[in-house]
Amino acid sequence: MMTDITACTLDCPDCCSLLVSVDPSGDIHIRGNPEHPFTAGFTCAKIRHFGKRLKNPLRKVHPMVRVRGRWEPIGWNHALDLCAEHIQRLRNNPLSMLHIQGEGAKGVLKQAGRYFFSQLGTSCVRGSLCDAAGYVATVMDFGSRENNDITDLLNAGYIIIWGRDVLRCSIHTAAIVGQARQNGASVLSISPGDDANSRFADRAITIRPGTDRFLAAAVIRLFLERNVTAPDIGQYAHRWNEFVRFIFSRSMESLIAACDVSQEDIDTIYRYYSDTKPAATLIGTGLQRYRHGGENVRFIDALAFISGHVGRSGGGIYYHLHSLRNLNFAWSRSAKTLSGRILRFPCIGQDIIDAADPPIRMMWVNGSNVINQAPDSHLIGRAFETVQFKVVVDAFMTDTASRADLFLPSTLMLEQEDIVSSYLHNYIQHAKAVVSPPGEARTDFWIFSQVGKRLEPPVILPDAETFFRCALSTDRLSISFEDLKKQNFIKVKRPSVAYAGMKFDHSDGKFRLPARLHSQEPVPDKFRLRLITPVSRDHIHSQILVDNHRLPLIVQVSSGCPYLADIDLSKDLYLVSPLQKLKVKLELSDRLHPEAAVLRRGSWMMTGGGVNQLIAARITDIGCGAAYYEQYVRIEN
């Protein structure tokens, strides 16, 4: 049984190197590559069972067109001609076409869709359903977005896991944290609770959801009160004196009350950051999914900065990096790019409906189950109905694909060649195609290339190898595409310590401190529980096989929740927002804040799930991110 080396292209930070083999019965076996320094021979359950996704009988592997409300088969040539006809008809009015691309898969060739539609000058989306507020916050603070090398965590004396479920988010980060703890590091977990960090943490602090900025500000105030900031810290910061006055304008009592912790909790966090041993901070994306999510991240950044743990080995701030930062994407900007219209991803339903002069008449969706994954799913569904022609490229009949007019079957990971990089570590990897695609499934790159040739004038995409060679042409790499295929992966040359010597990437070299601390908005009278929809251990976003859906959905609340007194737990239960309600099963936890309700995301509307039906579309303070966790709900019979 031959074994091939390839790489994971799912939307996961670990970007594992994989060993893949197919036995005589056709079963696909996947394991982590022991020769890869980061993957180190193990991978997560999502990957180990991925072969079942490839061979699932409900996978759609032939093009289909909707005719009088019913799906009918269509040949590829006819399907591509149909796409080209609709694009050609609207080409003189390109803003009437909308391209939506998500992060269903990573890789160089996955950028071909953005390249293709940018040449047409169509409408597109901006913002993010993931990490935009936190990403922009870190750039505002540091002048760029860099982390210490992830393995530098092994040099930490203290590790603060702030709003990140390391085991569910990144199994390799969890392993590194576990090893650091064995080496003597002390680990503190801060969150609204119900994460898997208890097995790593020496201490856990449970806070009111969305109030991380007040907690960080309280600890900063304690540093300033005791005058124990890092030596000469003021000379490394822009407007330091103004920041000090600003912090002292807020009382310690008000800050503590806002985040619902004790003075003892503040003292504990202070001890972790005030010691001379380096303290590393791992920031999760959940805490930036609030209206003031960017502000949450900025105050945590400020705490790490003023305590002297930035720019040193064993310290630093760890947040999502850009998955394309180690590759050259000049090819995507080399041709003339026309000016298009931009719609907001987090509010895509309302923005489609509001689009005028011209309205959206054609839509192309790839790499995204947008109706399921973006807020206010029903509104997005209604917006889709206003669009005359909708193309969805996918492998399954998802909540989004089921509303298309033309369905084009895509290849999946292991069936398509690409080059992929990580938003956690610094390895570039060749993702070899190691399994033949079923039926008539085709790559996104092939589809765009074929449609482009049918246009007049044509939109010609260079061949895949040209894109690969260009992507590898960067000062941080010295490897050819041929050599990368031979050795499978290479580590990019980057400093192991970010911002060493407190040298930041703003023009004056100084760190930027937050200047405002917004109060929390009042809690709605009839909806008192803050809805949190974190990741699952078993699947990426909504990439769940239909037979793996479990109903009713499980919602977790605190065993001390004060809002269950009038609920009959023996009867049917519903999670309710002003938009919609879902039937749920209640699970009580003693590790969750009393004002939080946790329902893990990804379930499909068509199977009775779909938590984003409950969540109104809101924008974060910076970055045009989706403020999912600003939604309040209640539980009722």
Task: Please report, for each region that a protein language model flagged, where it lies by residue.
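Flexible glycine/proline-enriched surface loops and loop-helix/loop-strand junctions
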Residues: F200-A201, R250-E253, L282-L287, I428-S436
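A glycine-rich, hydrophobic/aromatic-adjacent loop/helix-cap motif
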Residues: Y273-A356, P495, M502
